[in-house]
């Protein structure tokens, strides 16, 4: 089965101190422009690329993540590309992408990404007041202007960009304003990610959102997108719904049947099944010692993957289960009636699907061969 790699060459090191970061507190922020520790060694990088290229993939997809991967110099990514070319079989297709906070994009790095066709995901939560409420620099300063400057450099270089917006207490009450602002910057690919974090007492953190807020946000964005932007703007979550309705496939983790779409490779070569579960108890092995297929075939990995379908009676009886598949296990909390675990976003998903599914289905019907329907 195809799988991608999410690589963390600097682990959780970052030049920002975003309040909602789920790695917050695990590593001290790296000094701006200073040396980075931890850092993926040349030996781990080569072992990772070589081992991955020995697996059978339709496309070899490597996602450079963090922390903040651009703390590393361009030469690191150039070495990665060189290794990919050296280790790949003739005709192999390779796709690189990088997820960045956008504050450290130089013209040189942008030109490199354009030349090697890196997809660049940039984190931007909306206008300055929304974005900077939780996304702050290491010294507490603003970050919005630096992100816009990075986006401008990427645009001039011709890099394909995907905007990733975290939906938090900062912007959840202003969905259309957030969406239209991102569009005004020229964004044609947008991904919304819910902020769901709990404290040690299992109380929702101040920056996090409730399921009902998530639902209202999605419905409002959908209404605006449906009126004005079908075919012009790709909202990842909407594409995910369409992929399920048209092709009966999952293109995202949250609505997949199993948690087995990718592996995480830490800076030291340790491998984990998911970025939300980088814990000693979930370690599958190390690229210096274990093959990827060995780790994917392990009982620990199979049990983790199968956990996606360990939902309770609430999910099993839900008409929308084929669309959300119980949501990401990270978001699951004990159901109030004790009938297993259900997503903290469940109420929002139900509201969203309940108000939009009919129109999604008409859009899907229009895309199916031999069917002609008015999506509106």
Stretches found by the model and what they are:
Residues 133, 137-145, 152-254, 258, ...:
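Radical SAM enzyme [4Fe-4S]-AdoMet core and its adjacent flexible, acidic
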Residues 45, 49-50, 54-63, 72-195:
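Radical SAM/AdoMet-radical enzyme domain recognition
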Residues 278-376:
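Flexible mid-to-C-terminal extensions adjoining Fe-S/redox cofactors in radical SAM and related proteins
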Residues 267:
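Short, ordered coil/turn segments that flank beta-strands lining enzyme active or ligand-binding pockets
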Residues 4-43:
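Canonical Radical SAM [4Fe-4S] cluster-binding loop centered on the CxxxCxxC motif
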Residues 10-17, 68-71, 259, 315-317, ...:
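Cysteine-centered iron-sulfur cluster-binding motifs in ferredoxin-type domains/subunits
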């Amino acid at each position: 089965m195809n799988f991608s790699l999410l690589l963390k060459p600097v682990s959780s090191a970052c030049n920002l101190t975003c309040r909602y970061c789920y790695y917050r507190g695990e590593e001290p922020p790296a000094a701006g422009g200073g040396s980075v520790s931890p850092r993926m060694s040349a030996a781990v990088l080569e072992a990772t690329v070589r081992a991955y290229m020995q697996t059978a993939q339709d496309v070899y997809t490597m996602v450079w993540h963090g922390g903040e991967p651009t703390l590393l110099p361009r030469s690191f990514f150039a070495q990665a590309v060189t290794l990919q070319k050296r280790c790949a079989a003739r005709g192999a297709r390779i796709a690189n992408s990088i997820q960045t906070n956008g504050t450290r994009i130089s013209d040189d790095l942008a030109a490199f990404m354009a030349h090697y066709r890196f997809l660049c995901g940039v984190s931007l939560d909306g206008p300055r007041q929304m974005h900077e409420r939780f996304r702050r620099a290491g010294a507490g300063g603003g970050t919005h202007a630096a992100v816009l400057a990075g986006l401008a450099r990427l645009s001039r270089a011709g890099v394909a960009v995907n905007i990733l917006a975290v939906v938090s207490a900062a912007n959840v009450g202003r969905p259309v304003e957030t969406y239209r602002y991102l569009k005004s910057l020229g964004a044609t690919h947008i991904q919304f990610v819910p902020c769901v974090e709990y404290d040690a007492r299992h109380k929702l953190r101040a920056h996090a959102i409730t399921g009902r807020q998530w639902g209202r946000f999605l419905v409002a964005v959908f209404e605006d997108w449906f009126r004005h932007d079908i075919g012009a703007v790709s909202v990842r979550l909407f594409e995910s719904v369409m992929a399920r309705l048209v092709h009966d496939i999952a293109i995202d983790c949250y609505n997949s049947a199993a948690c087995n779409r990718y592996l995480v490779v830490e800076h030291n070569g340790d491998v984990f099944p998911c970025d939300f579960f980088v814990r000693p108890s979930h370690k599958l092995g190390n690229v210096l010692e274990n093959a990827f297929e060995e780790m994917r075939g392990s009982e620990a990995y199979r049990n983790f993957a199968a956990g996606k379908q360990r939902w309770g009676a609430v999910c099993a009886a839900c008409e929308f289960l084929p669309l959300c598949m119980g949501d990401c296990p990270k978001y699951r909390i004990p159901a109030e009636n004790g009938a297993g675990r259900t997503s903290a976003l469940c109420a929002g998903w139900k509201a969203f699907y309940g108000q939009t599914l009919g129109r999604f289905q008409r859009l899907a019907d229009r895309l199916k061969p031999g069917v002609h329907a008015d999506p509106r």
